Amino acid sequence: MADPRGPVDHGVQIRFITEPEGATEMGTLRRSGRRPARDARASTYGVAVRVQGIAGQPFVVLNSGEKGTDSFGVQIKGGNNRGSPGALSSDSELPENPYSQVKGRPATSRSSTSDEEPKDHLNGKLIRSQSQASLTGLAFMSPSNRSTSLLELAPKPTSSINTIDTAPLSSVDSLINKFDSQKGGQVRGRTGRRTRTLPHEQRKRSQSLDSRLPRDTREEREHQSANHWTRGTKYDNHVDSSKNPSQKQSPFSSFSRSRQTQDWVLQSFEETRDPAMVQFKSTPDLLRDQRETAPPGSADHVKATIYGILREGSSESEASVRRKVSLVLEQMQPLGMVSPASTKALAGQAELTRKMEELQKKLDEEVKKRQKLEPSRVGLERQLEEKAEECHRLQELLERRKGEVQQSSKELQNMKLLLGQEEGLRHGLEAQVKELQLKLKHSQSPDSGKESLLKDLLDTRELLEELLEGKQRVEEQLRLRERELTALKGALKEEVASHDQEVEHVRLQYQRDTEQLRRSMQDATQDHAALEAERQKMSSLVRELQRELEETSEETGHWQSMFQKNKEELRATKQELLQLRMEKEEMEEELGEKMEVLQRDLEQARASTRDTHQVEELKKELRRTQGELKELQAEQQNQEVTGRHRNQVLEKQLAALREEADRGRELEQQNLQLQKTLQQLRQDCEEASKAKVASETEAMMLGQRRATVETTLRETQEENDEFRRRILGLEQQLKEARGLAEGGEAVEARLRDKVHRLEVEKQQLEEALNAAQEEEGNLAAAKRALEVRLDEAQRGLARLGQEQQALNRALEEEGKQREALRRSKAELEEQKRLLNRTVDRLNKELEQIGDDSKLALQQLQAQMEDYKEKARKEVADAQRQAKDWASEAEKNSGGLSRLQDELQRLRQALQTSQAERDTARLDKELLAQRLQGLEQEAENKKRFQDDKARQLKSLEEKVSRLEAELDEEKNTVELLTDRVNRGRDQVDQLRTELMQERSARQDLECDKISLERQNKDLKTRLASSEGFQKPSASLSQLESQNQLLQERLQAEEREKTVLQSTNRKLERRVKELSIQIDDERQHVNDQKDQLTLRVKALKRQVDEAEEEIERLDSLRKKAQRELEEQHEVNEQLQARIKSLEKDAWRKASRSAAESALKQEGLSSDEEFDNVYDPSSIASLLTESNLQTSSC
């Protein structure tokens, strides 16, 4: 039956060609009818690709290339088939010549349209399998026909999908890199290894179908071109590859790669395969059976995934992509074989995963079951608790019912006894009545007997009446006594109840007192913790002081560095002064030369004038100037002496400063020692704090243990009371049983059994009492051990107090050291004052020297002006008198103009020096004002520091007082604990006495009960012995018994009064103890409040002291800065003084030279010449200039 014809699909025909040497040229790809140049290499290898459609599915023909014989086909399935799976067209059959003209219909793109693609196309893992196209296995043909189709290499059905994903696919990367190496064109041949690197824009995958349209249209244009597919083509781009030789590799590499792939293909042909796995496809018509989709583990699925991966990220043609797919599959076939070990491992892994899943499911189920059962469990627990409470209640009811049954049994026994006594009385009375009846019967017979009997009856009646009256009296007495006894019982019960209430009140009060004492102890521990916090604050203060000391050491280092810098600056200024001196000497030499020229002019004028009167006047003026010069020299010498003295003073001050620097170093060493001691103190404090924490924890544990011991003691005491009560009740039961033993033998046997049981219980109770006593002893021992531990803890606290005292001593030593530092600071300030005073003196002296120099300069300027006027007059006269000297006069006038310029320069220098002097004066005044302010601030600081030192001393004294008060309070607390212990002992004694009293009362009650029984027995005996015994004997016995009973009652009343008096005394003692404890507690609370207030005040004072110390530190820093500025001013003044001393030395040398000249016998003309010597004039000018500059 013919299938309907579907649309024709296109495949790719790939041919692998090997060209031996000398072989004819194979058909190559022709582009525009032109053959490419033949490659000169031997054994070339290539691939011929052709697209061909077979019944709506693409088909690939691969040919090995040996003279066009070796070829094989690969079917490419399209997942999107439009026709039926069995449709086959007659036009789509494979022709005999695989290289014939391809039909005009181009190959449409069957690439995948899925949006999921890998981001990097060079990735080697082939994980996706979402392509629509697929490659079938190779169909093996008969070996006789070399142009056969390949056999389909289907994998084993047992191999899972994971075999492809987990196997390493490095060969895929290499193959993809081979075929991605084109830059210019797409090479279809296998001429060499290609390394194509696509740009980033081409590697990106388009995320929609619209972005793929231009690529598909480009491919269609390539397929529709006439020159693209021609008859007998082998390579698609062989011409381009021949034009680009740079893309080719060596022939050896290309040959080796081609041979390797060909050998691998032949190996794949020769491998023995299972006939069930091999499908022989001799003709393309048989390929239509492969239209159904391949399973996810088959080779078709792998081919489809590879095709999708290679097709979706590249711009290559579909034929090249399919060729790459076939090559990748060739390289992947050996990797697809799964080893048995890996299959076993995978199977084991699958089993393990299955087991893990089962276990996880079981765990989830168990968790769910537990979650479901949790509310039921909670309900069951609640029900159990309720049932336990109900059981407890039922046990209590049983015990109550047992007590009621015992009481009812006791009452029944008493009733039985009373009934037995009444029956005995009834029997006795019946016997008497019978006897009387018999007597009456006997007496009825004779009359004499009647009379005697009547008399006897009368007598007996009288006796009976008397006995009845006596009996009534006795009964009344007994009733009265019984009433008295009941009243006494009620009073005793009330007294016992009141006594119990008082004891309970005392116990509660004792508990309250103990709780208050515990609270007071806790408060004391809190106070101790607060004191420790204060101690830590003090340590923080010490640390701050240490930091301040470090800052002072840093400041001293800064001062030293500033001192060195100032020294360097002084050296630089000295060098500058030397340079200025050299410049001044040069100027002096120039002035000397000028004065020599003026002297010559004056000599010429003098020779021309020869006026004796003028010469005399000039001589007088010269003498006056010489005297003034001598005076100036003397003043200069005095100034030199004063300067030397000042230098000595300054040297002394420098020595003092060096000593201060040494002291600063010593202080630094002391600071280091203090730091070491502080570190040790910190370590000690940490150890003490650790020990304190341990002691506090021990104290807490001891308190807890003490509380537990007290509770256990109370419980044991209550149990002892209960045991004693049970014992008394049992003794009473024994006594009652002994009373009942006088009944019958059966009752005695029962009572013996009961007594035996009760004795056994008594023994058990005695053993329990002994065990309780032993427990009490153990608890007492534990209590003693706890008291010992408490004593040790108190000793530890005392040790901590001692350590705190040691720390306080260390703080006092630090305070002393601080005071020493303050003293040294005060000494430094005093030295600063001395320096300021010396500076003021120097400033005053400099001002005086400046004033003197100003006066001298003014005089010299006036003299110079006079000399100038005289010289001008003489020059005018000389010009008038001698015209011959006109040229010389012109020269002199030029020299005078020069001198005038120099004088103007000197005047400007004087003006500048005066301005500098004024500024210096203003600076001095400002410095003096600052110094005064600093002195005042320093005095205020000293006063403030003294006040602070006093306050610190007072604070330290207060701290010592508080520590002493704390010690006293600790002692008081210890005394209170001792008193409390004594009170406890007294309370224990009172309890024992009360228990003794209770036992005595119970004994008295038992005696009373026994007496009542005896009275009843006596009554019965009296009733029974009325007719047999004489009344006198019975009455005497009854009276004696009554007397005994009265004596016993009196003795009991006496004992009762004694016990009441003792109880009252004990109550008074307890009240007194409670009052004392309350008073002591109030006193302790008051002291604690006072201590808290004092501590708060001390904290405030310490905070204020810290703030004041910080302010003093800031003021100290300011004072140090001002001292540094003052040092700089002093150094400037010292430099000026040195310059003045050098100037004075120069003046002295010049005066000595002038005196030597005076000693020589010179004429008046020579003296005149010496007066107008240029060196003298230059010296005068330089002296004035130097004085002004120094000012």
UniProtKB/Swiss-Prot annotation:
Subunit structure: Homodimer. Interacts with TJP1/ZO1 and SPEF1.
Name of the gene this protein is made from: Cgn
Residue positions, PTM Phosphoserine: 84, 89-90, 92, 129, 131, 134, 149, 159, 208, 211, 250, 268, 326, 339, 448, 1163-1164
Coiled-coil stretches noted in the UniProt entry, renumbered to this chain: 343-1150
Disulfide bonds: none
Residues that bear N6-acetyllysine: K567
Protein name listed in UniProt: Cingulin
Localization per record: Cell junction, Tight junction
Statement: the UniProt record of this protein carries the keyword Lipoprotein: no
Motif (ZIM): 42-56
Tissues in which the protein is found: Lung, kidney and intestine.
Function comment: Probably plays a role in the formation and regulation of the tight junction (TJ) paracellular permeability barrier.
Keyword tags: Acetylation, Cell junction, Coiled coil, Phosphoprotein, Tight junction
